[in-house]
Structures are given as structure tokens and as C-alpha cells.
Amino acid sequence: MGVSRVVTTLPPDPAEKTLPVPELNMEVQAQKGFNVIATANNRDKGVNELSSALMRRFNTVVLPLPATMDEEVEIVDRRVAQLGRALELPAEKPALEEIRRVVTVFRELRDGVTADGKTKLKTPSGTLSTAEAISVMTNGLAMAAYYGDGAMHAGDLAAGLTGAVIKDPVQDRIVWMEYLQTVVKDRNGWKDFYRACHEVI
């Protein structure tokens, strides 16, 4: 549902807890406990700005990104393990090193600088959130389970990672290619990662 559609169908007074359904020529009364939850992020604002009157009807909760690399790696590791069990993926739990590599890529591209602070980087248009890192890792786990040998390798992560970074096919592709060439290619122990991601592009 697009933003403009949400704006036109939300009740003018949320206290009424009634939602009109014009297509059915009726109104639906909310049950006890009903809530509308809207999510957003600071990089993807959509096409239509919400009015300040509408925004005041929501409680705003800001979830900052994890402060440290270790904290983000721990969150991704825990959630990927939970999702792997829930989805009953017959693959080995990903090595912490693979999670650390994905989180490193996300953090460096988000921050616009390498972890050592020596190289400035262009930032892509996407958010590269922790949730996306979890998604990339879970996708890699599924790839390893169903198309690989059950152990996660760089090739299992390459497509998901490239898709997470490249949202704009022109600008983000340039950002990703530059990052691969200037950072990943010469990084110690990342040759397999570089080759796998380069093959996807």
C-alpha cells in the first residue's frame, strides 16, 4: 500500500477506531488491542511526505544502529541462528567470520569510510540496516543448504549482499564496484569474497 493510499484511508480521528472501506460501502470497527504500525528509515523517505498532523497520530520510536561492530555481529549471529532453526534450514550455522565480513561491508558503506579510517567511501542509497544484514545471512544459509554443500561460503552471500547494496542500478552499482576494487580486492583474506561478488555483477 503506497503512502498516499495510507493517508487517504486512515481515519481522520484515530480515537474513533473506525476504518471506512469505500469499496465495500461499509466501516470496520477496530477490536480491542488494534494498532496501526508504520515503519520508516532515514534514507528511504518514499515519494509522498506524510503531513505533520498525521505523523502526530503515531508514537515515534527511534531505533539507533548498533554502536559497535561486535554488538552488531552478535545481533546478526543470534537472529540468523533463530531464523535458521525456525525455517528448519539443513545447513551449518554460518561461521562468525562470514557474519563479520557482511557486517563490516554494511558498516563501512553506511559510514562512508573503512573501519581503519584510512579510505573515504561513497555511500549507497539504501539503508544497509542490521535487519538487511540478517536477511543477507539467512539467504546465504538457504543457498548453502539447498544449492551448496551445507557450509556457507562467500559465493552463497554474494547475490544477497550485492542486492542489498545496489538499490539504484546506476549510482549504487558504481559505489559497489568502487568498494570492491579499492577495499575488498586487496583486503587480507577476502579474495574469495571479492571474486564471488565480482562474478555476480
Model regions and ranges:
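Non-catalytic, well-ordered alpha-helical scaffold segments
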Residues: S4, T8, R100, A131-T138, ...
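C-terminal engagement/docking regions of AAA+ P-loop ATPases
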Residues: A145-I201
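AAA+ ATPase "lid" subdomain C-terminal helix
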Residues: E108-D116, T130, I134-A154, G163-V170
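Short acidic/histidine-centered micro-motifs embedded in hydrophobic/aromatic stretches
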Residues: D13, V105, L157-G160
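Canonical AAA+ ATPase core
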Residues: M1-T9, P14-E88, L141-M143
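Conserved C-terminal "switch" segment of AAA+ ATPases
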Residues: K45-E49, T60-S125, Y146-G150, N188-E199
